[in-house]
A protein has these predicted regions:
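Solvent-exposed, amphipathic alpha-helical segments
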Residues: 17, 36, 40-43
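Residue-level signal for well-ordered alpha-helical positions
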Residues: 18, 47, 95-98
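Short, hydrophobic secondary-structure boundary micro-motifs
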Residues: 31, 52-54, 94
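Basic/aromatic recognition patch in beta-strand/loop cores that engages polyanionic ligands
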Residues: 39, 46-81
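Enriched for short, Lys/Arg-rich terminal
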Residues: 66-70, 74-103
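Generic structural signal for secondary-structure transition and capping sites
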Residues: 20, 27, 42, 46-49, ...
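Arg/Lys-rich, positively charged N-terminal/basic patches that mediate binding to nucleic acids
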Residues: 1-34, 103
Length: 103
């Protein structure tokens, strides 16, 4: 069985912030967001190459229900590294900048 994807601290912070925002909109919606994010991240262990490269070595798995969000990740020595969960309206340079800082 493939190893579970590793969630870096900035990605965990993104997930928590988005879940809190959704929970402020409607009680329980944050938990639904967390469930979908977890399912998407877990699916990356089985098929990490299924998503297209967005830039450099970074791939993005879009959420289905919470469409503006994507799970951004890269592969490093065969391991899936999740470094961010971003809303589509965020400037791409922020995503690129975070990936650059992690190199």
């Amino acid at each position: 069985m493939p190893a579970a994807p590793r969630r870096l601290p900035p990605a965990v912070a993104d997930i928590i912030a988005a879940a809190e925002w959704y929970d402020d909109q409607r009680t329980g919606l944050g938990d639904e967001f967390l469930t979908e994010v977890d399912a998407v991240i877990c699916s990356l262990a089985k098929s990490p190459l299924i998503h297209a490269i967005r830039f450099a070595d970074v791939r993005c798995a879009r959420l289905k229900r919470f469409k503006p969000y994507g799970v951004f990740y890269y592969l490093w020595q065969g391991e899936v590294i999740v470094f961010g969960v971003f809303h589509a309206s965020r400037h791409p340079q922020g995503i690129r900048g975070r990936r650059t800082r992690l190199s």
